Regions:
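Divalent metal-dependent phosphate-bond-processing catalytic cores, especially two-metal-ion Mg2+/Mn2+ enzymes
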Residues: 2-66, 70-77, 104, 119-132, ...
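"…together with the soluble PPM/PP2C metallo-phosphatase catalytic core" -> "…together
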Residues: 136
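Internal amphipathic alpha-helical repeat/solenoid segments
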Residues: 76-102, 122
Length: 324
């Protein structure tokens, strides 16, 4: 794509070692595994493609909170933006508790998406272009991109005239709700991560997070894919010095990360596939109980998971990853 830009001196000066970050992680209660073992695992966040977030959740009972705390320390976001440990802990613990106990759209999925997004950014040409604000907004967008998800699709919510669909005028219902919750949580006591941002950075951060989350709406998939393909491959004019282009690139990165498990080892992909199917089937059961038509992929009695996954990989995942 020809996008290249040196990381600012400010970023280089503030980058910390993994050991520094590990000191911050040790504050968490580890019940199953030792601190040293978990610190070693966390050092793979954003680095090891097939990192399994379920290990962290199983060991600590947390996923969002512990990964966020580790990354805020690693990239010195606390120091850069004057964010206290209390605010970091309170916001991300509140965010994690705001996720519902869905089979798929849960806090583990959010943390896994963040890991995958950071892998895309830090293990690619984008690494030399990342600025502290990019890291801050990417972490928040990834961890908040499904907060409050009810385990039901936009179409279901609209068809059943659910309150959230009424509130957001049937348009990207869930994604708008996720954005709103991500920001509204900052209004709670000891939760304002952006309290000391300049007005310019606050506006940039808000726009980035909103756009990144809204673009995870699969009904917008082919529109953003076509737009990105045109800019990246046809015109070859994406410029990371341009803020709107940065937002487009980060939005595409989050889209890819959102379905990133489809390109990981079979064990991980099959685990996530089973979970999303379980969630779909739960919706199908509700539709059956209401005598409504069962949505596509939601009928557990007539499911062909292998066929549906083959189509998903061929028509959605592969074209997306090829452009990215």
């Amino acid at each position: 794509m020809g996008v290249s830009r040196r990381l600012s001196e400010h970023t280089n000066e503030r980058r910390t070692t993994i050991n520094d970050a590990n000191d911050k992680v040790s504050a968490f209660p580890f019940e199953t595994y030792g601190v040293d073992e978990l610190e070693s695992v966390l050092s793979s966040v954003g680095k090891l493609w097939n990192f399994d977030i379920w290990f962290v959740h199983g060991a600590t009972g947390q996923s969002i909170s512990i990964v966020a705390k580790y990354l805020f320390a690693k990239y010195e976001l606390k120091t850069t933006y004057g964010i206290s440990d209390i605010v970091i802990d309170t916001y991300f613990q509140t965010l994690e508790k705001s996720y519902k106990n869905n089979p798929y759209h849960n806090s583990c999925h959010a943390a896994d998406v963040l890991h995958t997004l950071l892998y895309f950014f830090t293990q690619s040409n984008y690494a030399s272009s990342l600025e502290p604000l990019d890291m801050l907004t990417s972490i928040i967008a990834a961890l908040g991109h499904d907060v409050g998800h009810p385990g039901l699709t936009n179409r279901f919510l609209v068809n059943n005239r659910e309150e959230v669909a009424i509130q957001y005028n049937d348009s990207s219902v869930l994604e708008n709700m996720h954005c709103s919750k991500t920001f509204s949580l900052m209004g709670k006591k000891d939760c304002n991560l952006f309290e000391k941002l300049s007005n310019e950075d606050w506006l940039k951060a808000r726009k980035s997070i909103i756009e990144m989350i809204l673009e995870t709406d699969m009904s917008r998939h082919f529109e953003i894919l076509g737009r990105f393909r045109t800019r990246a491959l046809v015109l070859s004019d994406l410029n990371l010095d341009n803020f709107d282009d940065r937002v487009l690139i980060f939005s595409m990165g989050l889209k890819c990360a959102d379905i990133g498990h489809s390109a990981k080892v079979p064990e991980l992909h099959e685990k996530w596939t089973k979970l999303v199917c379980d969630e779909f089937f739960n919706q199908g059961d509700i539709e059956k109980s209401r005598k409504q038509p069962v949505s596509m992929y939601c009928d557990r009695d007539h499911a062909d998971i292998a066929k549906s996954q083959a189509g998903f990989l061929k028509n959605i995942c592969i074209p997306l990853f090829e452009v990215w």
